[in-house]
Amino acid sequence: MRYYPHNKGLFILRKQVPKHFPGRRMRDSKAYYGQGAWGEYVSQAGRISGFLFGYDVFNITVQTSLFCKRLSPGVSIMYMLKGSFAISNSAQVLKNVNCYICYLPRGETNYLLEEGHQCCFSLLFSVGNLNTLAPNIEKLQTFKDHIQQAPENSRLLFAGAITKNARRIIDAFCSNEQEST
């Protein structure tokens, strides 16, 4: 089981993904299926360029707001909210909301998903882990090793938990990703 924003999006996961579910699968990955506040959901885990990624697909059945904060070109922190929220209130709204680091092809920062849309994004690592590891990390390679050993449930991020040390590591990771692409 895994909790999503506001603890209202409980998904009970199971390995069998229905054939009707849209979207492609990651090669050599385990897929888990569930249902919850936003509709159907598939979570996958696989390695891309040596990093352990979670690739999640939501088949949206309710109106959902996505708010993305840019970290660097192509890399964002995404907040998934049920309903429609004004960005001017984001500081209050997002204080205790789960967020995710994700890759987006364009610079959209706030958009609404209607019923029937899909939402796909990649989860990388938990801010909680970053805060714990930050004082001891000298090189990105060490960080990569820690991420590969991170348990499945550590992929959740929390908006209020980002410290300066965590931000430094995120920035280092993002700049490294840009150089390698």
Label the predicted regions.
Residues 1-73:
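N-terminal low-complexity or simple alpha-helical regulatory segments
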Residues 20, 70-75, 140-142, 147:
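General N-terminal targeting signals
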Residues 21-23, 83, 139:
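Glycine-centered secondary-structure boundary/capping sites
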Residues 55-57, 76-80, 120-126:
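Short hydrophobic beta-strand segments that form the core of ligand-binding sensory/regulatory domains
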Residues 58-63, 82-84, 126-130:
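Generic structural motif
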Residues 71-90, 127:
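Glycine- and acidic-residue-biased ligand/ion/polar-headgroup-sensing regions
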Residues 88-181:
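Alpha-helical bundle regulatory/interaction domains
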